[in-house]
């Protein structure tokens, strides 16, 4: 059954069409963490990543998982099977091995401190929804899941995967993306997909036109823009998304062009779709 997901970021209604998922609003850009194996103790995600890496349960050759509190067996599909099955093969090929860790709550006790898994829900400023620990060829992705809607979890899962991809994108993908963004900047297109890239774009737009299309500020913006757009793209393949227009949104024709580019670079797996017209008529 296809459910509707309403996203209150900067995109356009009804652009993405896919398979399965709940109804929800996209959460703010801010991480939240999950829980410890032992209620009486706090463990940092770094400590848990070291401890858990040998005891993960395999989903696919590239993906494994572990729950730090009881998860009903009937929930495994929406937390694990469906989102992993929706990933394009070309995306999977670029990723390290990934361990998905479902925690009750994640907390950052101090502004620059380590993220910890805790049993009780932290105060809102300390709550983290997702974080990652990357060592060698294993990335451990931690998520706050207790009391969170599955659609929120999906957003953060795909955002963490997009972040990994943005650190490993091949030259061909990078050049393609840079070309798209330079065209947008030449046309003085305003708006973005999400808050991170929007803020970096504002800084870039304050520079002289000749200085906008290269250099570190441009590359930083391009990486975040790629991450935000890939998050939306992957989420849309997994789930049926209605995107709610916002005042900072990227104009729909430019967003569509980005998604078409990602579709050509990272085609969806069989029986998963990007645009409404991709869905076979019954």
Set out the residue ranges of the language-model regions:
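Pan-zinc metallopeptidase signature
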Residues: 24-56, 60, 212-282
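Auxiliary, metal-adjacent structural segments of Zn-dependent hydrolase domains
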Residues: 60-150
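Active-site alpha-helix of zinc metalloproteases
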Residues: 147-159, 163-164, 220, 224
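Post-HEXXH active-site segment of zinc metalloproteases
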Residues: 151, 155, 166-204, 243-248
């Amino acid at each position: 059954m296809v459910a509707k997901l309403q996203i209150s970021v900067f995109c356009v209604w009804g652009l993405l069409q896919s398979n399965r998922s709940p109804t929800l609003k996209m959460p703010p850009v801010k991480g939240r963490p999950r829980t410890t194996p032992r209620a009486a103790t706090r463990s940092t995600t770094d400590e848990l990543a070291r401890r858990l890496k040998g005891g993960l349960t395999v989903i696919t050759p590239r993906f494994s998982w572990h729950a730090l509190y009881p998860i009903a067996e009937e929930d495994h599909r929406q937390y694990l099977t469906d989102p992993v099955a929706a990933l394009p093969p070309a995306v999977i090929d670029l990723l390290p091995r990934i361990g998905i860790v479902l925690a009750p709550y994640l907390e950052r006790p101090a502004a620059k401190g380590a993220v910890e898994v805790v049993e009780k829900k932290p105060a809102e400023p300390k709550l983290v929804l997702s974080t990652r620990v990357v060592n060698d060829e294993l990335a451990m992705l931690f998520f706050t899941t207790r009391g969170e809607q599955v659609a929120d979890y999906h957003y953060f899962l795909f955002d963490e995967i997009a972040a990994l991809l943005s650190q490993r994108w091949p030259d061909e993908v990078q050049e393609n993306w840079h070309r798209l963004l330079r065209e947008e900047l030449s046309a003085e297109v305003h708006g973005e997909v999400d808050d991170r890239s929007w803020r970096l774009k504002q800084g870039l737009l304050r520079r002289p036109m000749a200085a906008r299309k290269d250099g570190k500020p441009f590359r930083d913006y391009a990486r975040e823009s790629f991450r935000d757009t890939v998050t939306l793209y992957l989420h849309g393949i997994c789930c049926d998304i209605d995107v709610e227009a916002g005042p900072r949104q990227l104009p729909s024709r430019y967003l569509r062009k980005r998604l078409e580019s990602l579709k050509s670079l990272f085609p969806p797996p069989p029986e998963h779709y990007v645009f409404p017209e991709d869905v076979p008529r019954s």
